[in-house]
A protein has these predicted regions:
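Residue-level marker of positions within ordered structural domains that often coincide
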Residues: 23, 69, 130
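Conserved NTP-handling cores and scaffolds of large molecular machines
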Residues: 45-46, 106, 132
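Non-DNA-binding regulatory cores of transcription-related proteins
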Residues: 61-63, 70-120
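Acidic/glycine-rich phosphate/pyrophosphate-binding loops and surrounding catalytic core
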Residues: 6, 122-124
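N-terminal intrinsically disordered, low-complexity, charge/repeat-rich segments that act as generic
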Residues: 1-55
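A broad, low-specificity signal marking well-ordered, structured residues that form hydrophobic/aromatic
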Residues: 16, 77, 123
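Short peripheral tails and domain-boundary helices/loops at the edges of structured domains
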Residues: 126-140
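Long amphipathic N-terminal alpha/beta scaffold segment
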Residues: 36-81
Length: 140
């Protein structure tokens, strides 16, 4: 899995939680590329306190409106931790290819990722409908 290198901003809390999540990750070798992409993103992201993150940044549990650049179809997704992921309900795991591609990007950015089947995907972030930090929830 390849994730385009883009400027990423993460809250310090999300960063710590994701590092801990990766330490406990017991998935097999089939997820090595995905794991490396997440580790690279965590290593290079700009970290900010939760109270200082801009409202246009995709953080954990942000609900985002995406536009598929191939089909033009719009879709709303919520970025979640694996235990809360329900893809059919629009909750995608941060450890999924699309979840990793979205985290830390801003409205107007294009997220690019490869599906497990090798299909290249791209979607523009049109809006953030909900971001916990903008609502005063700094511990979600």
């Amino acid at each position: 899995m390849e994730v385009m290198t883009l400027e990423r901003t993460l809250t310090e809390l999300d960063h710590v939680r994701l590092l801990n999540l990766l330490r406990r990750d017991t998935r097999g070798d089939g997820f090595l590329a995905q794991r490396r992409a997440m580790e690279d993103m965590l290593d290079t992201a700009t970290l900010v306190p939760s109270r200082e993150v801009a409202g246009d940044v995709v953080t954990m549990y942000s609900q985002v409106l995406l536009k598929d650049l191939q089909t033009g179809q719009q879709q709303t997704l919520t970025l979640s931790y694996p235990a809360d992921a329900q893809p059919a309900g629009g909750f995608v795991s941060v450890l999924s290819p699309v979840g990793c591609a979205l985290l830390g990007l801003t409205v107007g950015s294009v997220a690019r990722w490869s599906t497990p089947k090798g299909e290249e995907m791209a979607a523009e972030i049109l809006a953030i409908h909900f971001q916990p930090e903008s609502s005063g929830d700094y511990a979600m």
